[in-house]
């Protein structure tokens, strides 16, 4: 991994355009700021093209989707492709309903995505391998989830990042396993959405999206580990606050020392 990615990110302060869900929008904005990037939340059909033209990365998160929002996502995504802005798709709950599955596939067909970030069930559904979803949380997936991730990466020429106890990141050829993180991260809503924002922040400063996605997952996981070990943490509420602080206080040296990656 490139050791100075976090330093570059904080020097450049990439603008990350989000079209995201109403549940976690504030957390996504704040985590983007904490890692060192600049968030903008703009979803109106009339302005998304103009906004993405000024951005360094685009997040498309279907957590609370509507048909109008999907239209705005596709419009923004096509503009991002024209302006060579990386597009990060978070297909929240793909497989839970037909609308979510079909919308995710429609975006993938009409927009050149740079990174797809999801859990094992979401990724396996989009790879055509089956999977089981309850609500928007993964309840399981295919036996060989790494192969499902590689198949999806090759199908759309995209980096696939699958979050789990061990995160799997692949571009269809290379594959990395990230083992940073802590179970406390699952006790608060929105960690997946926030991770997507961090991925986009890193992708906004380097075009090797495989490497930048690994760096984002490692940084995010390390912050979770450090927050969980803090004496200030008494439960999910204090964990969340401390987690933001740990994201903010990350350094390239901390990432290099604490990373747990197999490539």
Swiss-Prot record:
Family, according to the entry, reads as follows: Belongs to the Thz kinase family.
Q: Which CDD domains does the annotation name?
A: THZ_kinase (cd01170)
Q: Which UniProt keywords apply?
A: ATP-binding, Kinase, Magnesium, Metal-binding, Nucleotide-binding, Thiamine biosynthesis, Transferase
Q: What is its EC number?
A: 2.7.1.50
Extract the InterPro entries matched here.
Hyethyz_kinase, Ribokinase-like
Annotated binding of ATP, by residue: 117, 163
UniProt cofactor(s) = Mg(2+)
Give the Gene3D superfamilies listed for this entry. Answer: 3.40.1190.20
**What Gene Ontology biological process does one annotation of this record name?**
thiamine diphosphate biosynthetic process
Q: Where does substrate bind?
A: 41, 190
Q: In which pathway does it act?
A: Cofactor biosynthesis; thiamine diphosphate biosynthesis; 4-methyl-5-(2-phosphoethyl)-thiazole from 5-(2-hydroxyethyl)-4-methylthiazole: step 1/1
Q: Which lineage ranks, top first, belong to the organism behind this chain?
A: Bacteria, Bacillati, Bacillota, Clostridia, Thermoanaerobacterales
**Reaction catalyzed:** 5-(2-hydroxyethyl)-4-methylthiazole + ATP = 4-methyl-5-(2-phosphooxyethyl)-thiazole + ADP + H(+)
Q: What does this protein do?
A: Catalyzes the phosphorylation of the hydroxyl group of 4-methyl-5-beta-hydroxyethylthiazole (THZ).
Q: Which domain of life is it from?
A: Bacteria
Output one GO MF annotation.
magnesium ion binding
Xref: Pfam families: HK (PF02110)
Tell me the protein's name. Answer: Hydroxyethylthiazole kinase
